[in-house]
Amino acid sequence: MRGGDVFASVVLMLLLALPRPGVSLARRKCCLNPTNRPIPNPLLQDLSRVDYQAIGHDCGREAFRVTLQDGRQGCVSVGNKSLLDWLRGHKDLCPQIWSGCESL
């Protein structure tokens, strides 16, 4: 590849990464949405008191929209260590939250 080709491909990648007109941020994947920041680990310690809704994939990992008991919402992906540890320790509840439990 010549220098100009590399520059053009980088510019194209950057343009593709930008939000497109008419596509609301609400439709983007939860953990990539800047208005819906990931929930800090300390709030995930007792996940039996948190409502999880699977929302598809986030950067190649399963992602969940999370509603805490006080009504706050956020998101978390399966790459989060607190969530993985909890799922491993609650194999009976895991299938209700995530279809990928058999891989743990």
From Swiss-Prot:
One of its GO terms (biological process) is symbiont-mediated suppression of host receptor-mediated signal transduction. SUPFAM superfamilies: Interleukin 8-like chemokines. InterPro entries: Chemokine_IL8-like_dom, Interleukin_8-like_sf. It comes from the Viruses. One of its GO terms (cellular component) is extracellular region. Pfam families: IL8 (PF00048). GO terms for molecular function: chemokine activity; signaling receptor binding. Keywords: Host-virus interaction, Inhibition of host chemokines by virus, Viral immunoevasion. Plays a role in antagonizing the chemotaxis of multiple leukocyte subsets induced by CC and CXC chemokines. Displaces the interaction between CXCL12 and CXCR4 and thereby inactivates the antiviral activity of host CXCL12. Interacts with host CXCL12. This is Chemokine-like protein MC148. It comes from Molluscum contagiosum virus subtype 1.
